[in-house]
């Protein structure tokens, strides 16, 4: 606070957002370059639209709306859904991580903890939602890589997988 006002600011933090552009120009009804949200929701779902808006660029910068970017977010959400749905027999809410772990399991647990730390920092301190989503994509890739090396699941594997997926 610079002390220029005789009263307290009405908020502690302010996040100003950039403009959404279409083909390099500000979206505008008069220009006819808007995106119909109903069409996006119908074709891809509201979660896809939200993910794309948050993932495309830092919130303070302008970003160019891209149908390819929307499709990429849709594919990513489906990839996460498949990871969970195809492996639901290995997921339990009552998981318990007991150390020491096998090396590959220890690596995944470490990766999850690093993602938690980075995501928490990016949300709490920097409002960098695009990097949060990037870290979540990296974590999803790490879980897929770990899962691809497993033919059978031990109890330890189930607990580690549950921890990674439910986190």
Language-model-derived ranges and their functions:
Residues 165-167:
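Amphipathic alpha-helical
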């Amino acid at each position: 606070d610079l002390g220029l006002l005789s009263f307290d600011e009405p908020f502690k933090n302010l996040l100003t957002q950039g403009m959404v552009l279409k083909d390099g120009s500000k979206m505008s009804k008069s220009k006819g370059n808007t995106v119909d949200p109903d069409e996006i929701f119908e074709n891809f779902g509201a979660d896809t639209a939200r993910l794309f808006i948050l993932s495309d660029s830092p919130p303070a910068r302008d970003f160019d709306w891209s149908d390819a970017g929307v499709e990429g977010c849709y594919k990513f959400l489906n990839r996460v859904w498949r990871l969970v749905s195809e492996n639901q027999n290995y997921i339990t809410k009552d998981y318990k991580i007991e150390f020491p772990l096998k090396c590959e399991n220890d690596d995944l647990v470490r990766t999850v903890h690093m993602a938690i730390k980075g995501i928490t920092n990016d949300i709490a301190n920097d409002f960098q939602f695009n990097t949060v989503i990037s870290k979540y994509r990296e974590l999803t890739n790490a879980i897929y890589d770990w899962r691809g090396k497993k033919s059978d699941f031990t109890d330890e594997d189930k607990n580690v997988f549950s921890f990674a997926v439910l986190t």
